[in-house]
């Protein structure tokens, strides 16, 4: 069934997929490369694919020639500038997380143009923006879990498992996993952990290894 909306008497067909992620092409880290490769695979399969991401700074040698908007291999990339501090300390990472998430929230109206939004766990609060988009625009959400929060933060001794932040993150993430349309995990072990600790229907969870970018598992 085609998802359409009316605007001044003209029926507009929604685009297929929007990627929402902090890092993307031309940045050279895995959390930028993997979404780019997935976007290319979806585009090659015949889907329309756009990207809403952060403007590159830390993981690129020179960003002076990087445009805010460009089309690469048929993929429309929209880059948004946000406050970026050094990621070498906890404070800088927190500022970056909230700054980028706030910028995505300010651009949430763009989400109404798409049938599906693919969102990643970096930063960990970013998926909340897509949940709001789901409620507002009835789009489907595919949640790609690179990391599990608050567990990863606790294991890195960034927060205590008894802390207020940990309890809030646990509550948010349990609801998040239930609300999204699909969950993508990177391994069978991660999938099993999600099923045992997030209360998710097994039918919603797929395993896609980092290197399995050629096949479409969604």
Tell what function each PLM region has:
Residues 16, 115-116, 182:
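Structural motif
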Residues 97-103, 116-152:
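An aromatic- and histidine-rich active-site surface loop
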Residues 128, 132-137, 163-183:
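Membrane-proximal helix-turn-helix segments that form the acceptor-binding/catalytic region
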Residues 195-196, 203-204, 212-218:
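Acidic anion/phosphate-binding donor-loop and adjacent secondary structure
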């Amino acid at each position: 069934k085609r998802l359409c909306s009316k605007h001044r008497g003209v029926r507009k067909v929604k685009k297929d997929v929007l990627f929402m992620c902090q890092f993307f092409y031309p940045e050279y880290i895995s959390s930028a490369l993997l979404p780019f490769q997935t976007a290319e695979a979806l585009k090659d399969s015949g889907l329309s694919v756009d990207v809403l991401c952060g403007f590159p700074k830390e993981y690129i040698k020179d960003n002076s020639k990087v445009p805010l908007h460009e089309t690469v291999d048929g993929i429309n990339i929209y880059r948004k500038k946000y406050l970026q501090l050094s990621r070498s300390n906890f404070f800088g990472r927190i500022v970056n997380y909230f700054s980028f998430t706030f910028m995505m929230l300010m651009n949430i109206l763009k989400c109404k143009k798409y049938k599906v939004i693919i969102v990643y766990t970096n930063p960990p609060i970013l998926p909340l923006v897509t949940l709001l988009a789901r409620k507002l625009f009835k789009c489907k959400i595919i949640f790609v879990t690179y990391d599990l929060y608050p567990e990863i933060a606790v294991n890195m001794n960034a927060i205590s498992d008894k802390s207020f932040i940990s309890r809030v993150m646990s509550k948010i993430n349990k609801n998040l996993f239930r609300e999204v349309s699909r969950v993508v995990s990177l391994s069978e072990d991660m999938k099993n952990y999600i099923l045992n600790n997030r209360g998710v229907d097994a039918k919603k969870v797929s395993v896609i290894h980092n290197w399995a970018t050629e096949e479409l598992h969604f």
